[in-house]
């Protein structure tokens, strides 16, 4: 069990707390005093192998989404997480297309796996009580590490960065149609190839539709270069 804690006084006290309340876990517990956004397989070598690991965390609410997406990108073997975040963040992470709160975090997380809100935690369990409610999000990664829709027939995988670039562009102007939001980068024939109506808005697309659009766009670009 490895704890990543940014605050030095807290990191210093953790081993003592574990020794007091979970003495049998002392030998398998270690603390890494650093910012969770800076961890990677090089500075956390315990997690470098292929063994799947689980993340359990009470995440700082303002950086919860970047931490989760960064860790999923860096650690292919992060298989499951159960995290406590602000209720609004939990709703955004687990939302489905078509909702006002469905956005970049929801659709990017769906590239990696499935997320659901599994519990709400009232503010009265904290002291002092915060002015927000909290919730738990349970995430399970797809066996291949990404949505099966990204697997191409030839065994290759649609490029994640390309998919995420489309997502960022579509949600950067979420009130606009896909045609208007993406016209500088995606030719109209790509929509046709992907079977996606360009008059739709980005907030109505599933991750698999973004993948289909990215695949069609990459094929169109290839043809242009030949």
Question: Model segments located where?
Answer:
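Catalytic cores of RNA-modifying enzymes
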Residues: 1-161, 165-166, 212-215, 223-226
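An accessory alpha-helical subdomain
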Residues: 135, 139-141, 148-189, 197, ...
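Short acidic (Asp/Glu) and glycine-rich catalytic loops that position anionic groups and cofactors
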Residues: 192
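Short, amphipathic C-terminal "tail helix"
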Residues: 196-226
């Amino acid at each position: 069990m490895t704890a990543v804690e940014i605050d030095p006084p807290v990191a210093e006290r953790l081993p003592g707390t574990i020794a007091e309340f979970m003495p049998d876990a002392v030998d398998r517990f270690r603390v890494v005093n650093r910012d969770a956004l800076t961890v990677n397989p090089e500075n956390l070598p315990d997690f470098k192998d292929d063994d799947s690991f689980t993340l359990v965390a009470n995440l700082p609410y303002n950086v919860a989404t970047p931490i989760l997406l960064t860790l999923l990108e860096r650690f292919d073997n992060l298989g499951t997480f159960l995290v406590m975040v602000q209720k609004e963040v939990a709703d955004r992470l687990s939302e489905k297309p078509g909702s006002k709160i469905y956005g970049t975090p929801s659709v990017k997380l769906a590239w990696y796996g499935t997320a659901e809100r599994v519990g709400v935690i009232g503010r009265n369990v904290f002291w002092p009580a915060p002015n927000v409610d909290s919730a738990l999000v349970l995430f399970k990664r797809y066996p291949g590490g990404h949505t099966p829709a990204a697997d191409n027939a030839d065994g290759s995988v649609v490029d994640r960065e390309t998919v995420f670039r489309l997502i960022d562009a579509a949600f950067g102007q979420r009130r606009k149609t896909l045609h208007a939001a993406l016209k500088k980068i995606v030719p109209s024939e790509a929509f046709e190839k992907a079977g996606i109506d360009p008059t739709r808005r980005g907030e109505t697309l599933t991750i698999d539709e973004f993948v289909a659009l990215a695949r069609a766009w990459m094929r169109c670009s290839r043809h242009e270069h030949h």
